[in-house]
Amino acid sequence: VLGSSTCALASSLVAAGFPSPADDYVEARIDLNLALIPRPLSTFFMRVSGDAMAGDGILDGDLLVIDRSLDARPGLVVVATHGGAFIVRRLEGRRGCATGWLVASDGLSTPIALAEGEAELWGVVIHAVHHLARPVPGRPPYRREKSRE
């Protein structure tokens, strides 16, 4: 899907809290196809439009990696068809129950009932890739410090 190239994989973990000393060398190579696409024949990519799932860290313009072979279960983020279009939502409901709801994390969108036939599950989102250097809704844009001359 992405070609056969590999990228450098640092041997150290990156701290999300307090920084820790890091090694200055590369331990291995990582193939993003293997890391992001466990089942290539059932994996699809879709670009996100809108911010209804921003509460789940899924932003406008993000790239979703979707696996159609996985069983959707409550709590997972899924892609569904609704009104002739694809939507991304969190599946809510009881496990093993034929009914459920597709819920956005923005608190504004109306939940969609699966039982009423309004929507059909299409696949399970396994990764969301987003660009960190672009502005994020609700946050001030990244600004470089002014040079002191």
Predicted regions and their residues:
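Short, positionally conserved secondary-structure boundary motifs
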Residues: V1-A54, P74, A85-F86, C97-T99, ...
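Short beta-strand-centered aromatic/proline hotspots
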Residues: L76-V78, V88-G93
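Structural motif
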Residues: G61-D62, L76
